[in-house]
Amino acid sequence: MPLSSETSEMVKQPIRQNRLHKVLHKNLRIPPWVIRPFYRALKITGSPTQYRLRKRLAGEIVAVTKPGMTIPDRAGYRLFGPDDIEGTDRIVRYCETVYQQSRADFPPEYFQKHPHKKFLFPILEGAEFCRHPELLRFMVSRPILDAAAAYLGTVPKLTGARLCWSPENETARSSQLFHFDYEDLRQVKVFMNIFETKEDQGPLTFLPADISHQVQRAIGRVLGRVPDERIYEGGGRNHEVKLIGPPGSGAFLDTSRCLHYGSRCNRRDRVVLIIQFLNCYSAFRPTAPFTVPSDLPGFEPDLVQKLALGID
């Protein structure tokens, strides 16, 4: 059933103010954690009706979300198994097929352009997911979307997705070191193992949010990549959670609050599906944005899913 003109107006995404964010941060060198609250308030002012709608729907979601699919605020993460989200087995098989096909066709020029990158090669990224409606439908299936909305307190926006392959490597650099993601004060990323993942495959490794906060209080604000020794000095030793498990296992993780790293010193291939949800009023501009068509085959999104996908 088509949306009413009033509801359709609510679903429209607020206008991005990224130029202002660039001036404040890049030119005036105001720290991003100072800019974000101001920037968000400005965007909310420009779209108050949608703001209230997203908050109201999130409140309704909290009331009905199963405890096993909620993300504890203190920990900032929730692990899940292959049977916890309906359709996971089908998506794992689909991603395995895409991976096998992509390995044969992976462009050699990518390695030439990125000679120092040895991990997290994108098999699918951004707009490429629009050619795979089954994956898009899964990414905003209500168990996944509701968990993100309940944690963030608002119906979020699907801001990014990647299917990544990490081959054997012996490196420990960049995102293979402990770090935070800085897109917003809070976010939800979903990491799903496509292959069975063990410790020798460079699994996603992270500290719970409360331990990460404790580490920051001890060593000072973490602004980049940090070696293990420094994290351990701050009390992080023996608190690591490693995302190992069978195909379809994974985690909802607030990577803005949980120190994390992954794909370090793989001995075997690792393939992971990564989905990102941010507050619609975040200052972050996706590096690989994509517009979702409103007529995905076999998919009739509800209002919450329309808001997450940015479908009018």
What are these regions (language model features)?
Residues 14, 27, 31-176:
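Non-heme Fe(II)-dependent double-stranded beta-helix
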Residues 154-157, 180-183, 192-203, 208-211:
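Active-site region of the double-stranded beta-helix
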Residues 161-163, 209, 255-257:
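Short, well-ordered beta-to-alpha junction loops that form the rim of enzyme active sites
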Residues 176-182, 258-262:
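Histidine-centered catalytic micro-motifs
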Residues 2-28, 212-312:
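Conserved double-stranded beta-helix
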Residues 183-199, 244-245, 276-279:
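Short, conserved beta-strand element in jelly-roll/cupin
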